[in-house]
Amino acid sequence: MSTVKRPLFVFAGQSNMEGGAAYPPSEQIRFSDSYEYLHKPRRFGEERGVFKKTAYPAGEFSYEKLEEAYSSLDDFRSLSSLDTFFEHTFFVPALSNLKSEADKSVYPFEGYSEANFVPSPCLPPYLARDWEARGHVCAYAHIAKGAVSIEHYLNPEMLARFDRERASIPGAHDARYRPAMTGAAGAYFDEKTRDFFADSEARFPGDDLSVRALFWLQGESDPNWPQAEYLLALRLFWEQARSLGFTHFFCIRVGNWRDDAIINVIRAQEQFFSETEGAYMLTRVSSYFPMPGRDESGWFIETPPAETQNCRDSWFGFANDHYNQKAFELISARCVPNMERILYENKPPVLEPELLRGLR
């Protein structure tokens, strides 16, 4: 019997990787032989995390202080009602904020907790589904959180290096969330990743787990960074990721979040993922999702293709510009063939033509 190739995937980034659409997923997805990893049992003292074959909920509430979030640490199945999660978590699951479809209203995300949240669609389940449809399997971990800078992922050592090295970059500045940055979230990212890899080795002892890929969709919180500053952060994060055992770094290119200055972040992503060994741009399509209420004639060279329309629930009247299920399914459809090319055919990815005025 041939060895099963089971790459291990980690999905990281901010809200458009986390999943923050208004509409919940249209249906549950049940994988044939792929799994999402949940780390919470480990934090409650269990020997291993758990692997599940259902897509939703996707991700998990990773509270910073367990004793603050839970009345008892005896049972990892207990659910915390601690909300205002941005202040109390390292990472969170995909969150839908639909209040009423009839009047197109949404809830503020801050009111959600582990006990009351509603799942949102997000990229990992659709990518795992499409990966299986092409005859492959995987295991994955969702480690994302909305409204965070790339600095959120740097552990204390890398954060200190970043502060030292960016001091010489013209125009470098403290990011919006910098005052609270300690490296603790980055350290927890390292912890969950290491445990995911170790628990995968225990759960799938006969499988080939040699491919370990980090997927990245982030940048909306860092729009005013100089290209060199974001490029430095990517280089340090990849160094950190390699030390954890990652073999590949995959980018879903960031899009515009109502600030054209993000073009420098996009330039940094293009540069890094074209010149760095083991790092690959999988798709640019996520840069091409129009946003309602904006004059984008100066942003796009030409109108993006029809398939990129209506990829945010704001097009349906909701005050929510996050990517929706259509967007994630389109991103997955673009990523998976390129993943096969890179991982199994030793070929470079085939990317979409450049449609951004500042890059062509």
Where do the protein language model's features map onto the residues?
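Cell-envelope and extracellular/periplasmic
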Residues: 2-360
